């Protein structure tokens, strides 16, 4: 039996939409007949993303937006409403991952400060920018991108994990306050090398926390296969031993949450590779 397409004609606004999860999600939504608003702080990246996604005329627009500035987020929403008259789905995807130990505070503080503004306040800004509109139109869906780092404290992930735990709290609070009006989905991806998040890591050694007791075995595996010559069973999604996801795998699950009847809300999704070594 063919599944019904609930994504078609929905208006989807994505922050951080020019790369990673956001870009993959935008592409998949367009393929299913949605209308997309891509926002990103990088204007050149927006132009590149628009060129790379084949969309019908007037089905997609790109807007520069710094999510740390609530007025810019509100303006992006208003521009979206001018074009499409409604917003069905708000995806708060923009984020950074400045992993570092507390001992790194002198070099990490500025990155941590920005992380709080982007990962926490950016999500809050996205919520309040669409809240009144979704209430007025009678329905809507807010999708917040959290992380498995939000599940439990680990060394090196204190500030990043705290911002993502705060996202979980915002998501659940919004759900409680808007039942029957706004659907809320919280997405907790595992580590996904194909995104730009790793570029923000302050201290590369801080990734040890998420591996915990599996660190030694993981390092042995990498040392046994230098030059990224990792066996196929660890790199293909058709293998139970897959070590790491691609951004598209996460985007597929976000699409799943969007592609539901109006009365069905997928509240919380954890997406991980079946063979990943992360302890969270």
Regions found by a protein language model. Name each.
Residues 43-44, 64-76, 109:
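The beta1-alpha1 cofactor-binding region of Rossmann-like NAD(H)/NADP(H)-dependent oxidoreductases
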Residues 101-116:
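Substrate-binding pocket helix/loop in short-chain dehydrogenase/reductase
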Residues 176-264:
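SDR active-site lid
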Residues 2-36:
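Canonical Rossmann dinucleotide-binding motif of NAD(H)/NADP(H)-dependent dehydrogenases/reductases
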Residues 127, 163:
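Active-site helix of classical SDR
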């Amino acid at each position: 039996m063919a599944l019904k397409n609930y994504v078609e004609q929905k208006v989807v606004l994505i922050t951080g939409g020019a790369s990673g999860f956001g870009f993959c999600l935008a592409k998949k939504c367009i393929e299913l007949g949605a209308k997309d608003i891509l926002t990103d702080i990088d204007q050149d990246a927006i132009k590149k993303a628009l060129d790379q996604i084949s969309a019908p005329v007037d089905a997609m627009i790109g807007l520069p937006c710094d999510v740390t500035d609530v007025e810019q987020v509100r303006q992006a929403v208003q521009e979206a409403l001018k074009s499409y008259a409604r917003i069905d789905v708000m995806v708060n995807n923009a984020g950074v991952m400045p992993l570092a130990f507390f001992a790194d505070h002198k070099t990490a503080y500025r990155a941590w400060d920005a992380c709080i503004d982007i990962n926490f306040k950016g999500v809050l800004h996205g919520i309040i920018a669409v809240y009144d509109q979704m209430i007025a139109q009678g329905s809507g869906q807010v999708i917040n991108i959290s992380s498995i780092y939000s599940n439990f404290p680990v060394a090196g992930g204190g500030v990043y994990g705290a911002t993502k735990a705060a996202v979980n709290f915002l998501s659940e609070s919004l759900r409680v306050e808007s039942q029957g009006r706004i659907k809320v989905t919280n997405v907790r991806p595992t580590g996904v090398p194909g995104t730009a998040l790793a570029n923000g890591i302050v201290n590369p050694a801080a990734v040890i926390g998420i591996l915990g007791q599996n660190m030694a075995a993981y390092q042995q595996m990498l040392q046994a296969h230098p030059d990224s010559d990792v066996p196929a069973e660890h790199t293909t999604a058709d293998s139970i031993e897959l070590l790491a996801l691609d951004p598209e795998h996460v985007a597929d699950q976000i699409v799943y949450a969007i592609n539901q009847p109006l009365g069905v809300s997928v509240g919380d999704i954890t997406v991980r590779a079946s063979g990943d070594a992360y302890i969270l």
